[in-house]
């Protein structure tokens, strides 16, 4: 049970790994943390691993990914979050498969201008070994890379329940959360 008296059973969410992906400002962290709170499943993001284990160097980045991938492999339910693309995407997929428990992959898709506006308001600094490009450039680029990874990896894996969930730019967190909770509760 969580602080709101809800449990994974009450939410009708079977034990599974739930990977939330999306570009900067898409609401991944907000939705994933709320889902973790309401299910009792542990939450892990690559950014949290970077903060905890990284130091802004390549070694720190590798160390952060080692921890994130170990959690992907672990045969236990969890709520996971990263953008869903990049050089480690195939390792994430492979390690999720190694966990041998059901996996739902949910891509949060919002209008890019909404994501740019949200990401531009952030103050949080994440240790990362490469310089960040301006948000207005990064958001569409990341979206395009996720699109490629979605078509070539996430939606093609038959052992994953993969859902591309699109929202309007005015969708509230509650609307997004309700849709994600429904996806995770659905029988495969």
What feature does the model see in each segment?
Residues 125-183, 187-188:
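Small-molecule kinase domains that catalyze NTP-dependent phosphoryl transfer to phosphate-bearing small molecules
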Residues 27:
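Conserved glycine(s) of the Walker
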Residues 99-122:
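Conserved phosphate-donor/acceptor-positioning beta-strand/loop module used by diverse small-molecule
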Residues 30-76:
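Conserved substrate/cofactor phosphate-moiety recognition/catalytic segment
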Residues 2-11:
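Pre-Walker A adenine-sensing motif
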Residues 78-83:
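Structural recognition of the conserved hydrophobic beta-strand(s) that form the central parallel beta-sheet
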Residues 20:
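Hydrophobic anchor at the beta1->P-loop junction of P-loop NTPases
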């Amino acid at each position: 049970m969580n602080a709101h008296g809800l449990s994974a059973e009450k939410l009708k969410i079977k034990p599974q790994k739930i990977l939330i992906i999306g570009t900067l400002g898409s609401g991944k962290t907000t939705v994933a943390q709320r889902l973790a709170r309401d299910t009792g499943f542990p939450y892990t993001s690559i950014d949290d691993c970077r903060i905890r284990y990284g130091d802004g160097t390549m070694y720190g980045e590798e160390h952060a990914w080692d921890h994130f991938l170990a959690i992907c492999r672990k045969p236990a339910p969890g709520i996971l979050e990263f953008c869903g693309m990049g050089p480690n995407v195939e390792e994430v997929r492979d390690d999720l498969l190694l966990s041998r428990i059901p996996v739902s992959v949910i891509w949060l898709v919002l209008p890019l201008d909404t994501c740019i506006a949200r990401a531009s308001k952030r103050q949080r600094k994440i240790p990362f070994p490469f310089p960040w490009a301006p948000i207005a450039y990064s958001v569409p680029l990341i979206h395009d890379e996720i699109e490629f990874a979605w078509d070539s990896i996430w939606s093609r894996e038959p052992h994953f329940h993969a859902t591309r969930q699109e929202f309007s730019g005015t969708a509230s967190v509650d609307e997004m959360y309700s849709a994600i909770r429904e996806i995770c509760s659905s029988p495969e």
